[in-house]
Structure formats: C-alpha cells, structure tokens
A protein has these predicted regions:
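Rhodanese-like catalytic fold shared by cysteine-dependent sulfurtransferases
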Residues: 1-19, 23-29, 37-70, 76-117
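Active-site flanking residues adjacent to catalytic metal/cofactor-binding acidic residues
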Residues: 32
C-alpha cells in the first residue's frame, strides 16, 4: 500500500517498455539514458541520449526547450532515473517519465538494444 501511495506523489509517471515505444512514436519523446558510458555502449534504447548522472540536471543543454516535451529517463534498473525525474518535475518540466525497471525491463520485454555510441 505504501508503495502505491508513494507512486502517486512522486510527480512523474512510470512507463512499461511498450508505453515508452508508443510515447516516442506518437509524441517524439526525448529519451535520456543515465547509465555509465561503458554500459551505454554495451547496449541502449535506439535514439536515447547518454548523459552521466553527475552532469545531468534541469539546466542540461540537452533539455533546453524541452519543458513541455515528454522526457523519459532511463537507467539500468530505474533507481537513478527516479531521482533525476523528481529534480526535473521540481524545475517545472511538465511531462516527466521513467522506464520502470530500466534497461533490464526493456531486455526482458525482448525489445532490441543498440550497441556503441
């Protein structure tokens, strides 16, 4: 019960892999992968942009002009992305999402990953 209540008040929406695909296709969502560079190169969601958590924030140049655009944060498991999503919501970003379960959930859904930068 606590988890469900916390989910309602966190300010961002969690997405399943299929929902992420729909959001990218229908609303041109910006997908930001907060994984370490070497993990990103081993496999990431096509079209996602890699930003290290230490240099990520509402003022990051990648997010310039994206306050009303859907922004989906992704990491390996969903933990890092959740913390970053809260910062974006606080800064006034309207449509902030996190891929529930991260890249691991994407792989479990048998969806493809791209290697390299």
């Amino acid at each position: 019960v606590y988890t469900e209540i916390a989910r309602l008040f966190r300010g961002y929406k969690g997405l399943r892999p299929a929902e992420l695909t729909q959001l990218v296709n229908s609303e041109n969502a910006l997908v930001v992968d907060l994984s370490a560079s070497n993990d990103f190169e081993k496999g990431h969601i096509a079209g996602s942009r890699n930003v290290l958590p230490s240099s990520f924030g509402p003022e990051h140049k990648l997010l310039a002009g994206a306050k009303s655009q859907p922004v989906v944060l992704v990491c390996r498991t969903g933990q890092t992305a959740g913390a970053a999503a809260k910062r974006l919501k606080k800064a006034g970003f309207e449509k902030v999402y996190v891929l529930d379960g991260g890249v691991a959930a994407w792989q479990q859904a048998d969806l493809p990953l791209v290697k390299g930068r």
